[in-house]
Every structure is written in structure tokens, then in C-alpha cells.
């Protein structure tokens, strides 16, 4: 019985060793010689809130099997080229950004940062982050970093090791040494990345419900004048469209539907106090012709659109009593 047990254990150990070798064959750390990273942020959101933390690839990636006991993961980087300024090539506008490392600590040109620790090391792409301060009001478009982000990486990540003895993924020239003797960070490996920020068109819409009130006959419901406020991205003219509501009749005729039956009360919406219908397509309303602040596209000033809602049902007085309502969708088009 004892002899069989010993043979079984020996076979298990051999099998375990084979599995370990197979996994290590797929493990590696690498530094990207070139790459492009881009983030997107809506323009009004950027101005009001900024962008707290958008992730991008730092250039260092480690993948595969790692089994280490009582071993230090050595990791250091030095920033050799970078810019906190991003430029829109079409307009010349600038965005200011803050770059942070995987510990959410700000990095700067020429900085050398030791991130060594008793861990298994990175698992996948090691992230960096971009933070955009609030208060920046810029046109939509692509903003490219004024210079690439060049980082020199120094690393020694344990794959399989016990107390300094084993297999390590290492940057060029790295030497762990022994007992503190012969340690050398080596020459490192360079990553070079191009960063860009895409600022998206964005708007804020302020609209209120229209209430005709109550009348004995629908024909006695007076027209209601209201106003809608819209502000959009810097240097971005736009159009405002209204759809035909939930229950259009005879094509594009807007109509309110009874809450209790299948009857309708026709109405429509007109620009300012005119008979110029506000709709979609050729009936859109240009921001250049807004009632208040037309053509002011600075991202801060609101355009106001005064409109009049009228009952237009020729048979309004035959419509049964009840509560009628509709929902109209506002669409901003750039």
C-alpha cells in the first residue's frame, strides 16, 4: 500500500510540472513601441463637470501565468516626452489635461517613479488616466496632444519564483542581483503613444409642459404662448425639430388623445406668434433665427424659442368632454 502511494505522488508531481511549463509558454511582458489612445467627452458636460478619469493604455502589458512566493515585482517608469496641452487642428483651440499613472498620481515630464511592490505584477495592460478640468469651453472636434507620450519602462516581474530564484519577465539589462549586490535597472524599454481627445457636440434643453386649461367647449381654449431654452456647444449652429406627437391625424396633423377613449383633439405649434408651423425638415427652427440670442453659440448663452400652441380642430365643439394629452419630442440637429 505504501509503495503505491509513493508512485502516485511522484506521478502527480511530474504532471504538475508539465502543466506549469505549458502555461509559462504563453506568459510575457511587453512594451508597445507605438500606439494610439483616444477618449471622448461631450462638450457641455466637459465645461460643467470636467472628465474625472478616462483610462488609456500606458504601453506596458503583462499577460499569462504567474506564480511567485516572497518575491518583489520591480517596476519603474520615467517620462521622457509628454504634453498636457491638446490642440484642435481645425480651430487652433486648446484643451488642458492632467495625466495620471495607475496609482492615480499625477505624472510630469522628466519624472521617474518607482512602483515596485510585493505583488504578482501587472495583469493585462497597465492603465494610465486622463483627467480634464471643468470650465473648458471649446468647439467639438478632435484635440491631439502637442507631443507624444514617451515612457521608459524598467521592470522585473516574477513568472515562477521563490525568494528570488526562478523565472522573471524583465526589461533589457535588468539585473536583480543577490542580497542587494549587483542590482541594476538596466537600459529599460521605450513606449511611445499618441493621445487624442474627441469633444462631442452637446446641448442642454429646457422645456415646460403646455396646459390649455379647462373650457366648456374646446373652441374656447385660448392659444398658449410658451418658450423653450436651448444652449449647445461652442461655435456650433444647430436646428431644432419637433415631431408630430404620439397620435398624428391625416399625416402630420398633431392631435391630443382622450385619456378615456379613442377620440382626438387637433392642435398645432407655431413659431413665435405667427402661423409658421414648427415641425421637422423644412419646418425646423434654426438657431440663427432664435427668438432671443439668435446665433450666439458660445456654449454658455441660451437661445430662447417662443412658440404658440393652438387648437385647430374645425369640429372642436363636437369633441367629447375629457382630458386630452400628447407628447412631442424635441430633436436638436447639427
What are these regions (language model features)?
Residues 2-13:
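Bacterial N-terminal signal peptides that target proteins for export
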Residues 115-124, 217, 294-301:
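Short proline/glycine- and polar residue-rich coil/turn motifs
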Residues 87-102, 252-276:
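Surface patches in mature domains of proteins
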Residues 81-123, 279:
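A surface-exposed loop-and-adjacent beta-strand signature within N-terminal beta-sandwich domains
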Residues 269-293, 302-303:
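Outer membrane beta-barrel transmembrane domains
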Residues 21-24:
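N-terminal signal peptide c-region/cleavage motif recognized by signal peptidases
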Residues 26-84, 129-144, 148-264, 301-334:
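N-terminal small/polar-rich segments of proteins
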Amino acid at each position: 500500500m505504501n509503495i503505491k502511494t509513493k508512485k502516485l505522488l511522484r506521478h502527480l508531481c511530474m504532471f504538475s510540472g508539465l502543466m506549469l511549463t505549458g502555461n509559462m509558454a504563453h506568459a510575457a511582458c511587453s512594451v508597445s513601441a507605438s500606439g494610439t489612445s483616444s477618449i471622448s467627452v461631450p462638450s457641455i458636460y466637459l465645461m460643467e463637470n470636467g472628465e474625472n478619469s478616462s483610462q488609456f493604455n500606458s504601453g506596458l502589458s503583462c499577460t499569462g501565468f504567474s506564480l511567485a512566493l516572497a518575491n518583489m515585482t520591480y517596476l519603474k517608469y520615467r517620462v521622457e516626452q509628454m504634453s498636457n496641452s491638446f490642440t484642435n487642428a481645425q480651430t487652433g483651440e486648446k484643451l488642458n489635461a492632467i495625466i495620471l499613472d495607475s496609482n492615480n498620481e499625477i505624472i510630469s515630464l522628466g519624472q521617474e517613479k518607482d512602483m515596485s511592490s510585493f505583488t504578482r505584477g501587472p495583469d493585462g495592460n497597465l492603465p494610465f488616466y486622463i483627467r480634464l478640468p471643468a470650465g473648458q469651453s471649446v468647439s467639438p472636434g478632435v484635440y491631439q496632444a502637442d507631443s507624444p507620450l514617451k515612457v521608459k519602462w524598467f521592470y522585473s516581474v516574477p513568472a515562477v519564483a521563490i525568494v528570488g530564484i526562478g523565472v522573471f519577465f524583465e526589461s533589457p539589462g535588468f539585473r536583480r542581483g543577490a542580497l542587494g549586490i549587483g542590482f541594476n535597472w538596466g537600459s529599460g524599454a521605450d513606449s511611445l503613444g499618441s493621445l487624442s481627445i474627441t469633444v462631442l457636440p452637446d446641448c442642454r434643453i429646457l422645456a415646460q409642459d403646455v396646459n390649455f386649461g379647462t373650457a366648456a367647449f374646446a373652441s374656447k381654449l385660448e392659444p398658449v404662448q410658451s418658450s423653450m431654452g436651448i444652449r449647445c456647444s461652442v461655435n456650433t449652429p444647430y436646428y431644432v425639430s419637433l415631431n408630430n406627437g404620439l397620435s398624428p391625424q391625416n399625416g402630420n396633423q398633431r392631435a391630443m388623445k382622450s385619456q378615456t377613449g379613442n377620440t382626438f383633439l387637433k392642435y398645432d405649434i407655431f413659431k413665435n406668434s405667427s402661423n409658421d408651423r414648427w415641425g421637422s425638415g423644412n419646418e425646423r427652427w434654426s438657431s440663427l433665427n432664435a427668438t432671443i440670442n439668435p446665433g450666439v453659440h458660445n456654449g454658455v448663452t441660451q437661445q430662447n424659442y417662443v412658440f404658440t400652441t393652438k387648437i385647430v380642430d374645425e369640429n372642436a365643439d363636437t369633441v367629447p368632454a375629457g382630458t386630452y394629452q400628447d407628447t412631442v419630442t424635441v430633436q436638436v440637429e447639427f
